[in-house]
């Protein structure tokens, strides 16, 4: 039943029936943990991979010993970095040892290796002053994958791919004649036996003895024309290196570098783990019948007798006893199953090895050698440490290759299973740490090359580590990754939810991932393994659908990068759920039967029903309670945070829920946020983890509170913590970040308590919109097609008013003609235009500005022009050289307005770091209050979006029996066809709750049922059907039928009409066609397309049409004359020929068509072509002011280009005597044979 729950400072009445057994993990730990791992272990791994660097003779050895991030010497704090456009980073110091083997001399030095970007507490990076997020990438895990295709006769042809993290691929395929082929590194096919021979099994008999008598393998041997190991090696060499003379030695070294060299071939830890899991004996021989006795190689005891069935547990023992291969009997055929010979170390040694930290399986032959040669614990541990790279090889080994071939052979007989590439057990996450590690590795390997070169060139006696190291390649690799990688994204900072979702995003795109064009339907589709790991709902609509996903609420990422989800363990004996929680990866979960979280249980966790609904893979089954393995921890475990914030999600259609999840991320923070009356209970957790709320670092007592800072006296040592609040700062999306304290003086706070609200939060809960009194009623057609009718009250009371802050900057540079200057003294500007500009030439804070107003006065020197005689005379008399400058002030762009809230000035003199050539930089921040207006987009949380069609006076809105008018009218027809009934239930429950004075939590899939809502309605004193008689505000008459009225939570989205509306009279024109540019950003015009032309033709509006196609578009002369005529008030002249017509003629002439333009009298009309001088003669500048002009990419900014040419021309001495007739006119053929 409904019960109170304390959420932060607010009490909500919760309808949830499932008690959460486990805490939801920190929502941004996918970012924080990954980066922390990188600093702790990831960097070590890279340095270990590259160690040691030796020169070609081997007498100089350079080693990276240790590293540290120098946290004391961080240049600026996070806030300062944002202000100064700096990168938040710490210097990386590496201690390096250089050893000279000839002299035995050792030099150690600490070398600075560049600034390394640091992650903020919120899981973001500040790069050049902008907050960025590194999105995690979903990629295929390295490992071995088996698949099959079906040929024309319906036979299954098995194929397989061995995918390393980096290195050559191995692909096996079968043709319809049952011959198995292999491709090495995407080259031509070879028979599989050639590969096996090259790995050391020379003759046919050896091959058959090793792999067992198998028909397809025999067929492959017959197809193969090599008979010995050497021939096989040469054959492979010919395929891989065609055109080079094949020798056995070069073939052996080629195969070694391709597969067995850790620098060239890397399986990575994940790859090794997947390999061992797939190729181990236990899963392959379980439940099969043994064809021979299986003997333990160490003790000689018989583990399974011939003809016995091998159970799962025994299979596990066989695997860990180091048995290399097992013969099983299938339909009277003996099939040999070969493993890759890896065993569990714990089962092989008698003592405790937990201090070695080895979790993986180890290579049995290597281990056996160690155990045979050593007996005491200490030396065995020492040897294991020494040989760790052999015990757990990072590259592939011969045993792996034999096992993959054996697996391929066994598939035909049902031994083993094929893989599903879209299964989350085969896809893994590359998070920040790993992406950074890969980038750092690239930088280091480039540096390694430089170091080797320098070792050879420089004097070996005087050499020091510092001289060898060049940090440029490393710094460049890191910078490139943060600056331009597809996965390093500008943080979506519209509201706290959008920040949080951005950090939890999973992308299948990016380097090493898929591309939009190639991704098929299967990759994008929802898969059963997504359950509890990836949200099935939240994904963009459009070309990226299904490629960009969101992490589910309870999901975690394990050390291998696989996504895990928690389940409660069921005690099968007693049929009760324990409180033990375990995290499972997708392939571990596949064996289990999982009950849902809502399954009724008594207080001891015993199932109430005898039969239970469970999920197994993609099936839902009903089984007795004794068969249940696991139970979901929570009902919201399958969805992401944004989706979990939609109440009554279970009553919505999935595609509308998708829109609801996506639109919540676009909600603009309002002036006074309001938490939803009908919430889901996750709002508090989401706000706290998003990082927008200041939290108390230590427990204590609040001693001082103001709008901009909070002081807390610590309990531990009596010191004071000071928390500065952000006031009216601009976010990445141009919304306003403002924090307000929610604690009082004298209040006791505990550690990590929220002490202030941020943007879009209310008492520490996410509050994206407002609770609005609304009704489902049509009103005079203003609800047509999802439009919304709103009351003037929402405008007057600033219910949906939001703050937007735009940033404009102006820099004074050095030009070739002298420095630009920021000043109040601007030529040809009236005093009125400078009324708010101070004596520095910068606008004052608090001034109200409109488009075209000067923000920063700036003048740029102009080139000296030729003076006329009169001017020279005046100059001579008055002796002053007129300052030749032009006005290049920063003005408010077209269509913008607001109030100046902040000015920042950076100058060289103050020691600020500026770009080269910049002397001064001024930033202005303009804030606007945007009230809700017609054309703004609003939405509910259920995908019910619409545009405001009319703002009606309050007195005309339909009103309730108690006289209160509605605030919004929505169209009732928007509900049934879209099947998002959740909004109706929300309205009912909100109506009851607002009268009872409750805030409600109705968790997704575990929320209020219809009887419970009805009960609340009756408790609040309403009709059961929740309908009300409404009265028409214009006449006072009641409407014919009762109407559903209630409280709906409505958001104002970021698509505001003020940003979309746009007008142009004249402005920039395209270079070739001379037509106006398009789009608001380019200050372009509206395209009058073919359909619009048809409309005018149908009207017969010939003159309008002619005007649109000529003077309003690309008749260059005509448009200038028209402009003049309008200014002077004369009649508009006849249009000329449009430029695009001339372009068309030129294109036809380029096709060798002789085209002439004739007039009515059939006389040729010459089309004049314009050169720049003619353009200059068209005096009027109708391209708009210089600020609005879009710079053409080819045109240089300054005039230096033209001037240089003039000087060159002046220096040429013309030789008068040359006669043009004497010059050679014939082309000699030699001219063509010139090298150029």
UniProtKB/Swiss-Prot annotation:
This protein's encoding gene: rpoB
Statement: the UniProt record of this protein carries the keyword Nucleus: no
Species this protein is from: Clostridium beijerinckii (strain ATCC 51743 / NCIMB 8052) (Clostridium acetobutylicum)
Region Disordered, residue ranges: 1193-1212
Substrates-to-products reaction catalysed: RNA(n) + a ribonucleoside 5'-triphosphate = RNA(n+1) + diphosphate
Coiled-coil regions, chain positions: none
Nucleotidyltransferase listed as a keyword: yes
Quaternary context: The RNAP catalytic core consists of 2 alpha, 1 beta, 1 beta' and 1 omega subunit. When a sigma factor is associated with the core the holoenzyme is formed, which can initiate transcription.
Highest taxon above the source species: Bacteria
Record-level GO cellular component terms: DNA-directed RNA polymerase complex
Comp. bias regions, Acidic residues: 1194-1212
EC number: 2.7.7.6
InterPro entries: DNA-dir_RNA_pol_bsu_ext_1_sf, DNA-dir_RNA_pol_bsu_external_1, DNA-dir_RNA_pol_su2, DNA-dir_RNAP_su2_dom, DNA-dir_RNAP_su2_hyb_sf, RNA_pol_bsu_bac, RNA_pol_bsu_CS, RNA_pol_bsu_protrusion
Protein's recorded name: DNA-directed RNA polymerase subunit beta
């Amino acid at each position: 039943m409904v019960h109170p729950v304390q959420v932060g400072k607010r009490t909500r009445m919760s309808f949830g029936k499932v008690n959460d057994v486990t805490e939801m993990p920190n929502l941004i730990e996918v970012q924080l943990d990954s980066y922390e791992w990188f600093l702790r272990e990831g960097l070590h791994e890279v340095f270990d991979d590259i160690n040691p660097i030796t020169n070609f003779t081997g007498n100089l050895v350079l080693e990276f010993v240790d590293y540290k991030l120098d946290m004391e010497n961080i240049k600026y704090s996070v806030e300062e970095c944002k202000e100064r456009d700096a990168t938040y980073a710490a210097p990386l110091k590496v201690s390096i040892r250089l050893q000279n083997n000839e002299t035995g001399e050792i030099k150690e030095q600490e070398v600075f290796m560049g600034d390394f970007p640091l992650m903020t507490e919120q899981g973001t990076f500040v790069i050049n002053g902008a907050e960025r997020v590194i999105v995690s990438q979903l990629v295929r895990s390295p490992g071995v994958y088996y698949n099959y295709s079906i040929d024309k006769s319906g036979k299954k042809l098995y194929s397989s791919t061995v995918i390393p993290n980096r290195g050559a691929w191995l692909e096996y395929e079968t043709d319809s004649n049952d011959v198995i082929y292999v491709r090495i590194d995407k080259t031509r096919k070879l028979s599989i036996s050639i590969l096996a021979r090259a790995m050391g099994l020379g003759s046919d008999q050896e091959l058959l003895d090793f792999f067992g008598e198998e028909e397809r393998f025999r067929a492959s041997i017959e197809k193969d024309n090599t008979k010995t190991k050497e021939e096989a090696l040469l054959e492979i060499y010919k395929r891989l290196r065609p055109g080079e003379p094949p020798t056995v030695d070069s073939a052996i070294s080629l195969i070694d570098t391709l597969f067995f060299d850790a620098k060239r071939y890397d399986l990575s830890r994940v790859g090794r783990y997947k390999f061992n899991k797939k190729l181990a004996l236990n899963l392959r021989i379980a439940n099969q019948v043994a064809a021979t006795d299986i003997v333990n190689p160490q003790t000689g005891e018989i583990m399974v007798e011939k003809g016995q069935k091998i159970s799962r547990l025994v299979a596990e023992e066989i695997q860990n006893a180091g048995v290399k291969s097992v013969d099983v009997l299938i339909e009277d055929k003996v099939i040999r199953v070969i493993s890759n010979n890896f065993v569990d170390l714990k089962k092989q040694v008698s003592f405790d090895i937990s201090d070695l930290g080895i979790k993986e399986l180890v290579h049995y032959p290597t281990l056996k050698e160690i155990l045979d040669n050593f007996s005491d614990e200490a030396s065995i541990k020492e040897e294991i440490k020494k040989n760790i790279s052999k015990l757990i090889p990072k590259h592939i080994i011969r045993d792996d290759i034999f096992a993959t071939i054996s697996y391929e052979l066994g598939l035909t007989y049902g031994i083993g299973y094929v893989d599903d590439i879209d299964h989350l057990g085969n896809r893994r996450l590359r998070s920040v740490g790993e992406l950074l590690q890969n980038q750092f590795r690239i930088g280091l390997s480039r540096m390694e090359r430089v170091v080797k070169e320098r070792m050879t060139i420089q004097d070996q006696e005087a050499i020091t580590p510092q001289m060898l190291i060049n940090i440029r390649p490393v710094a460049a690799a890191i910078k490139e990754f943060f600056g331009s990688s597809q996965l390093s994204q500008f943080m979506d900072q519209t509201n706290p939810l959008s920040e949080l979702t951005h950090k939890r995003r999973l992308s299948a795109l990016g380097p090493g991932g898929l591309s939009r064009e190639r991704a098929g339907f299967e990759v994008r589709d929802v898969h059963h393994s997504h359950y509890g790991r990836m949200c099935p709902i939240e994904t963009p609509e459009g070309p990226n659908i299904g490629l960009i996903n969101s992490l589910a609420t309870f999901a975690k990422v394990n050390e291998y990068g696989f996504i895990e989800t928690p389940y409660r363990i069921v005690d099968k004996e007693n049929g009760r759920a324990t409180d033990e929680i375990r995290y499972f990866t997708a392939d571990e979960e596949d064996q289990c039967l999982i009950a849902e979280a809502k399954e009724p249980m008594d207080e001891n966790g015993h199932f109430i029903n005898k039969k239970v609904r469970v999920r197994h893979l993609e099936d839902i089954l009903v089984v007795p309670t004794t068969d249940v393995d696991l139970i979901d921890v929570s009902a919201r475990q399958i969805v992401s945070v944004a989706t979990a914030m939609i109440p009554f999600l279970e009553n919505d259609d999935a595609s509308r829920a998708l829109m609801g999840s996506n639109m919540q991320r676009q909600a603009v923070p309002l002036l006074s946020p309001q938490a939803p009356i009908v919430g889901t209970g996750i709002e508090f957790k989401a706000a706290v983890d998003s990082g927008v709320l200041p939290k108390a670092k230590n427990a204590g007592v609040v001693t001082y509170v103001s709008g901009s800072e909070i002081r807390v006296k610590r309990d531990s040592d009596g010191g004071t913590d000071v928390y500065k609040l952000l006031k009216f700062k601009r976010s990445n999306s141009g919304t306003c970040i403002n924090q307000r304290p929610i604690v009082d003086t004298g209040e006791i706070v505990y550690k990590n308590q929220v002490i202030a609200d941020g943007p879009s939060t209310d008492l520490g809960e996410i509050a994206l919109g407002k609770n609005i009194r609304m009704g489902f009623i049509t009103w005079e057609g203003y609800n047509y097609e999802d439009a919304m009718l709103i009351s003037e009250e929402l405008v007057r009371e600033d219910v949906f008013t939001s703050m937007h802050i735009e940033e404009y900057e102006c820099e004074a540079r050095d030009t070739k003609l002298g420095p630009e200057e920021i000043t109040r003294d601007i030529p040809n500007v009236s005093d009125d235009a400078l009324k708010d500009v101070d004596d520095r030439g910068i606008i004052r804070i608090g001034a109200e500005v409109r488009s075209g107003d000067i923000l920063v006065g700036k003048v740029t020197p102009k080139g000296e022009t030729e003076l006329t005689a009169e001017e020279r005379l005046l100059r001579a008399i008055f002796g002053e050289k007129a300052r030749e400058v032009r006005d290049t002030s920063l003005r408010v762009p077209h269509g913008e307005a607001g109030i100046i809230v902040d000015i920042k000035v950076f100058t060289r003199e103050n020691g600020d770091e500026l770009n080269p050539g910049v002397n001064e930089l001024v930033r202005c921040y303009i804030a606007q209050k945007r009230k809700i207006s017609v054309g703004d987009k609003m939405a509910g949380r259920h995908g019910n979006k619409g545009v405001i069609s009319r703002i009606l006076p309050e007195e005309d809105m339909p009103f309730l029996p108690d006289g209160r008018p509605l605030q919004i009218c929505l169209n009732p027809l928007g509900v049934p066809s879209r099947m998002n009934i959740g909004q109706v239930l929300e309205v009912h429950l909100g109506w009851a709750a607002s009268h009872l004075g409750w805030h409600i939590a109705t968790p997704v899939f575990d929320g209020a049922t219809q009887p419970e809502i009805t009960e609340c309605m009756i408790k609040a004193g309403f009709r059961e059907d929740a309908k009300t008689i409404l009265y028409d505000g214009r006449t006072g008459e009641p409407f014919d039928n009762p109407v559903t009225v209630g409280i709906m939570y409505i958001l104002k989205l970021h698509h505001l009409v003020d940003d979309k509306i746009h007008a142009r009279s004249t402005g920039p024109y395209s270079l070739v066609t001379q037509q106006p540019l398009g789009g608001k950003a380019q200050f372009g015009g509206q395209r009058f397309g073919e359909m619009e032309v048809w409309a005018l033709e149908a009207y017969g509006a010939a003159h309008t049409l002619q005007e649109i196609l000529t003077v309003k578009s690309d008749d260059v002369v005509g448009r200038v004359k028209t402009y003049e005529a309008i200014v002077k008030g004369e009649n508009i002249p006849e249009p000329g020929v449009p430029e695009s017509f001339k372009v068309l003629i030129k294109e036809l002439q380029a096709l060798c068509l002789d085209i002439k333009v004739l007039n009515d009298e059939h006389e040729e009309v010459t089309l004049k072509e314009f050169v720049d001088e003619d353009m200059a003669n068209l005096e009027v500048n109708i391209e708009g002011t210089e600020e609005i002009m879009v710079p053409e990419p080819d045109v240089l900014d300054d005039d230096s280009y033209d001037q240089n040419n003039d000087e060159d021309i002046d220096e040429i001495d013309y030789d008068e005597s040359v006669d043009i007739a004497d010059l050679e006119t014939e082309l000699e053929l030699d001219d063509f044979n010139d090298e150029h």
